[in-house]
């Protein structure tokens, strides 16, 4: 059984042990893994983001299936989790609302017309576009995520001064995104080579910002 071979029960047990009561858990994935991930915790599953990438992959299978140009970002949490939507810029618009007429003792009196103005800001949609990590420079991990995307997610679910945990930190892009957004970060990585490379990357970035 594919599902039973996944370490989801142990993973969720540890996540619940260390996270705050209403803190969201945000996990990257692709199918069929993402479906298994959601089914492993349907009670806390909230929704998915779809990350539309600037660069597609799976070129070796291009004659058999579409190129893969997206990744899923699944959000979990207990109860009402923090959410600070980052508004998108668009064209300003306005709606007119007319509320009919009223009859009085001297005849029909029209109600005023109300106009709802919007300067163009819109709430985010579930599909978000970000360039891949290669656009930000040399990558050191096969699954390295772009810092810009991680900053977006961090700002969406946390406030300045909060602590972010990345228990599969790889290149430690999350730590760098936390530096830029003034959050604290705890990184965990079981591969010593990746950890060493990621730590060096974070130190270099931190020194650069201090100059």
Where are these regions (language model features)?
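S-adenosyl-L-methionine
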Residues: 205-211
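Core catalytic lobe of class I
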Residues: 1-195
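Conserved hydrophobic residues forming the short capping helix/wall of the S-adenosyl-L-methionine
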Residues: 202
């Amino acid at each position: 059984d594919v599902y039973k071979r996944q370490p989801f029960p142990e993973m969720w047990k540890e996540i619940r042990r260390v996270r705050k009561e209403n803190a969201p858990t945000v996990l990257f994935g692709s199918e069929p893994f993402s479906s298994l991930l959601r089914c492993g915790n349907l009670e806390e599953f909230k929704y998915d983001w779809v990350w539309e990438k600037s660069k597609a992959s799976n070129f070796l299978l291009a004659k058999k299936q579409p190129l893969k140009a997206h990744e899923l970002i699944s959000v979990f949490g207990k109860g009402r989790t923090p959410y600070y939507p980052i508004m998108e810029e668009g064209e300003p618009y306005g709606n007119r609302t007319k509320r009919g007429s009223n009859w009085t003792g001297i005849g029909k009196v029209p109600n005023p017309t109300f106009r709802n103005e919007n300067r163009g800001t819109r709430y985010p949609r579930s599909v978000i576009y970000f360039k891949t990590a290669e656009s930000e420079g040399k990558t050191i991990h096969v699954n390295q995520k772009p810092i810009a995307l991680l900053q977006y997610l961090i700002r969406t679910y946390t406030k300045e001064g909060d602590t972010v945990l990345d228990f599969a930190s790889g290149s430690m892009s999350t730590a760098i995104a936390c530096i830029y957004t003034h959050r604290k970060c705890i990184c965990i990585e079981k591969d010593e080579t990746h950890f060493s490379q990621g730590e060096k990357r974070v130190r270099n970035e931190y020194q650069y910002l201090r100059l």
